[in-house]
Amino acid sequence: MTQIGKECHNDCVIKQQTGECIMPREGVFARVLKGGEIHVGDEVTLLPPLEDPPLRAAVITLSDKGSRGEREDKSGPLIVEMLTAAGYVVEETMLLPDEAKALKAQLIRLADSRQVNLILTTGGTGFSPRDITPEATYAVADRNAPGIAEAMRYHSLSITPRGMLSRAASVLRGKTLIVNLPGSPKAVKENLEYILPSLGHGVRIAAGLDGECARK
């Protein structure tokens, strides 16, 4: 019995030599929902998987000032609120500076180790030299999913011509969908309200939980 996506917490010698820890990839995997203990020899009852498990998400806010405590993060909590209302389980939130290396590391960890279904970032999608979110997102992608970012730009242009200035990306890494949202709470709300009704189906297809979305 081991946790889903178990990580190496000590940067062990094996990882340093091979670049990858040797972790179980088969067997009984579990996620801790409530604290407790399990011991060798304990009897374990396996329950059947849920027919319609909730989608799991993570939210990353990118802000130099926010990471230094100079600005309150309002967009991240708003995204969590909207995702929760839509039925997602938000498993992690974090506030990072506008640093590509740190963002790429977290995107890889959340997609590969935590295996969340959806990662939403907020901030860092404009023209400032420190706006590196799209580049970091593309760098970790396996496949592009441009329609989501294009839909957000289309919707934003119906509100303000400045919508054309968004460089937001939407990609897939493995079975995880990663979408860049704007930085301002107002723009976050407008964009997320627009894409959320259709987003879940795409997330479920990527996760292997739904079939394709062809129209009859």
Role assignments for model-derived ranges:
Residues 41, 47-57, 82-85, 115, ...:
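SAM-dependent methyltransferases
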Residues 133-216:
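Proline/glycine-rich low-complexity loops and linkers
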Residues 1-53:
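Metal-cofactor-dependent catalytic cores
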Residues 60-61, 121-122, 180-182:
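Short beta-strand segments
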Residues 20-23, 38, 50-52, 112, ...:
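Solvent-exposed alpha-helices and their adjacent loops that cap or buttress functional pockets
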Residues 82-84, 89-121, 126-140:
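N-terminal small/polar loop signature for handling phosphorylated ligands or for N-terminal nucleophile
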Residues 52-98:
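Glycine-rich phosphate/diphosphate-binding loop of Rossmann-like nucleotide-binding domains
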